[in-house]
Amino acid sequence: MLKLFAKYTSIGVLNTLIHWVVFGVCIYAAHTNQAMANFAGFVVAVSFSFFANAKFTFKASTTTMRYMLYVGFMGTLSATVGWVADRCSLPPIVTLVTFSAISLVCGFVYSKFIVFRDAK
């Protein structure tokens, strides 16, 4: 299981880079607001995460149901962490680091035992 987690973590690093690049392009090139930029970054990064983890981490097929389960869970997790951060007036960097840590662990457990539970 540690080997799987290491693969999942590697893809997570790429996800973070993708999210930040899309966010930056939206803010500085497309001149969107932060909410739109963050949403766009999330959608692109979480989609990459799903397909990359299905292929390289879990060696599983991709289905619409699996995609919806994964994106729905990660989106809910993201919104919840953001809501709590707003309620607690946390600085954005604290929110980012907190979400990164929580999503890494929770996303891995959810993927292994729910989304890709029947993968070999």
Curated annotation (Swiss-Prot):
Any one cellular-component term (Gene Ontology): plasma membrane
Superkingdom in the source lineage: Viruses
Chief subcellular location: host cell
Transmembrane segments: 10-30, 34-54, 65-85, 90-110
Topology of this chain in the membrane: Multi-pass membrane protein
Gene Ontology biological-process entries: polysaccharide biosynthetic process
Keywords: Host membrane, Membrane, Transmembrane, Transmembrane helix, Transport
Location within or outside the cell: Host membrane
InterPro entries recorded: Glc_translocase_bactprenl-link (IPR016480), GtrA_CellWall_Glycosyl (IPR051401), GtrA_DPMS_TM (IPR007267)
Role: Involved in O antigen modification. Involved in the translocation of bactoprenol-linked glucose across the cytoplasmic membrane.
UniProt record similarity statement: Belongs to the GtrA family.
Protein name, as recorded: Bactoprenol-linked glucose translocase
The organism of origin for this protein: Shigella phage SfX
